[in-house]
Amino acid sequence: MFKTLALAALFLAAAGAAHAQSLDEMAGQMVVVGFQGDGVEDAGVVALQAQIAAEEIGGVIYLRTNVASLPAVRAINAALAEAAPGPLPFIMLDQEGGQVQRLTPSVGFAATPSARDVARQGLDAATALYADLGQRLAAQGFNVNFGPVVDLNLNPDNPVIARFGRAYGRDAATVAGFAAAFIAGHHAAGMGTALKHFPGHGSSLEDSHDGFVDVTDVWSPAELDPYRTLIAEGLADMVMVAHIYHADYAGGEAELPASLSPEWIDGVLRGDLGFDGVVISDDMEMGAIRSRFSLRETVLRAVLAGNDILLFSNTAAYHPELGSEIHAILVAEAEADPAFAARIEESYARILALKQRLGLAG
C-alpha cells in the first residue's frame, strides 16, 4: 500500500511538472532510438548526443553491434548522460540471458543463463544471479534492462520464445515468481525493467520480428496472469507491448497489432489490469510494423493507442537523425490537435515519474 501511495505521489508531482515544460521537451522524452557506432567519437554517437542536448530524444537502445569493449560502453554512456540538459536519458538494452545478451563474455561481461535455465536452478539462485546482473549493468552506465520476459511457454514450437529458452515456464505463478526476482535484483541496483511481451507471445506460431503474427486462435487469457500479479504487487516499471494481432482486440481493423491497439493498451492493460506506469512499444522497425505502416502513421497510431515511449532500433535503414524526425512528427501533430498534445503531456508525466524513481530526474 505504501509503495502504491508513493508511486501515486511521484506521478502527481510529475504531472504538475509537465505543465512547466514545453511541448518540444515533453515529446522528446517519448522517443528512444538505436544507433550505429561503438565509440564515443563515432558519428552515430555524436548524433545521439546532439539529439539529447536538443531534447529531441529521451533515451537510447544498445544492440550488440554497439559494444566494442566495456570501457568504450562506459565512455559512450557517460557522454550521453553529460549531454542531457534536463532529465538524464534512459540508456537501455536487452540483457535477458541466454540467446538475448548485448554484453557478452567476448568483451569481459560474464554470461547470464537463459530464463529456462535460471528456472531449473531455482528461485534462490535466481535472486542472487539477478542481483549480481543488475549491479554489473549499472556499473556500465545502463539504467533500464528490457526484461523480464513474462511470456508463458505454451507452444513448444514457438520460434521466438520457446526456441531460445526465453520463458521461465508454462505456469503463470512460476513465471511471476522468477520475474519478481529479476525485477528486485535490478531495483536494488537502481535500474528499471520492462515486462514483455504484452499481451503474451508464448503461444504464437510466428515471430513478429519477421512479419505479421496472428494469435487469435492460439492466445489464452492466462497469458495476462503474470502481468496481473506483478502490476498488483507494484513491480511493473514498464510494460513492453508486442506486435501481435488478435481479431477480438483490433477494433474491427484488419491486422492491427497490439502495439497500435487502444483496446489492448488503454482497455486491457490500463483498464482491466490497472497499470498506470510507462508503456513502451516493442521495436517499431520489426517486420510486423514496417511492412504495413509509414513512419508517420506508426508514430501517430502508437501514441493514440496509449504508448508512452516509442522504441525504434534504427536498424531497418539506418538514419542518424531518426530521433529528430520522430520528434518533429510528434510536435507537429500536437500543435494541430489538442487531444494529441494532451496524450503527450500524460506520457511525459509517467516517464518523468519513472525517471525520478530511478534517480534520472530531480
Describe the residue ranges of each PLM region:
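Gram-negative bacterial Sec-dependent N-terminal signal peptides
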Residues: 1-20
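N-terminal hydrophobic targeting/anchoring segments and the immediately downstream early-domain regions
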Residues: 19-105, 311-312, 353
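Active-site mouth loops of central-metabolism enzymes
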Residues: 32-43, 115-126, 209-221, 285-293
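Short, acidic/polar
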Residues: 40-52, 126-133, 221-227, 294-299
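Second-shell residues forming the walls of enzyme active-site clefts
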Residues: 60, 68-83, 174-335, 339
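Glycine-rich anion/phosphate-binding loops
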Residues: 69-73, 120-132, 173-177
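Glycine-rich, aromatic-flanked loop segments that form ligand/cofactor-binding clefts
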Residues: 84-110, 130-153, 175-199
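Mid-to-C-terminal alpha-helical segments outside catalytic/metal-binding sites
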Residues: 329, 335-362
